[in-house]
Amino acid sequence: RRQRQMCIRDSSIVGVVILLCILVFRNVDLGIHAPQSLLSLSAIFLILTFGPKAANLLGAFGGLLINFVCIWILMVLGCHNVIYYNHSTLVLGYLLLFGYDASGSAYTMRLFAMLFGFILTGVVFWRNHRKKTYKRGLRDLFNEFNLHSSRSRWQLLMASAVSSVIFIASILNLPRAMWAGIAAMSVLLPFRTDIKKHVCGRIPGNLLGGLIFFLIFPHLPAGLYSVVGIVGGIGVGFSASYGWQAVFNSLGAMMIAVSVIGFPQAVFFRIAQNIFGSLYALCFEKIFHTVTERKLESKI
């Protein structure tokens, strides 16, 4: 029964990642020549499929390198136009697939699901964006990477902060290390003035979400467990502020975690990892920009 639950959970996670990609790329292009966009999209799906698995297989130290490289490539390929906030789909999808690892037949099914997801996303992307013309090609995305560019610094910041916070959480043996990574990813926005505001929304939001879950879970019939995630998803859709999104997001995450690490551990570690990840990202961002700005000034 436990194996069946894990297969259902893995299918749900992969389904969420694919759905997010379809919804995003239905409206957003990659800012390069359409045929080469499909090459970029294929690279993105290859990373989403094999990167998280490789990071899990290689442990904390090997995972640090794999996560950094994969997240950086995702940022360069998919987040060239920062106003689209594509990182909230691509990096989130990567971290979900990393956190909910699969093996054996479950991973084989994941491979087929990701292949299907790529085909479906590619069809939607090509149908909606094939007539758009750009002089920029796939190679230009990497050629334009330059630390004098705020976009490039943000891409490097994201890869560095998220991979390192997961590494620290892993070597400390904290359950659900991906939560710290997701927290860091969520607050590291391309516009620096928004970062502190998101930190101040995410931490109280997870505290309130944890309190709500702690109070209702002991009294919830087992048959209604799946409803919690649905309610959380609906709540996110209707939330007018980032803080309330954090509240409802935490409900579904803790519901899944209960089956893995138990109750009330899921509540404690959800809150702890989000506080850690958010504050780590805030401090890392300040240090990162201080160091890079000094290096850039020294070269002038």
Located regions from the model:
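Transmembrane alpha-helical segments of multi-pass membrane transport proteins and ion-pumping complexes
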Residues: R1, S40-K53, N67-V76, M114-W126, ...
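Short, small-residue-biased leader/transition segments that mark boundaries at the very start
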Residues: Q3-I8
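Hydrophobic alpha-helical transmembrane segments
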Residues: R9-G15, A55-I66, D101-M109, H148-W154, ...
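Pore- and pathway-forming membrane helices of multi-pass small-molecule/ion transporters and channels
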Residues: S11-D29, I44-F45, L64-S103, F118, ...
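Membrane-interface helix-loop-helix junctions at boundaries between adjacent transmembrane segments
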Residues: P52-N143, L147
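Membrane-interface capping segments at transmembrane-helix boundaries
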Residues: W126-R136, K286-K299
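Membrane-water interface at loop-to-transmembrane-helix junctions
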Residues: F142-F167
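Transmembrane helical segments that form the transport core of multi-pass membrane transport proteins
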Residues: S163-F217
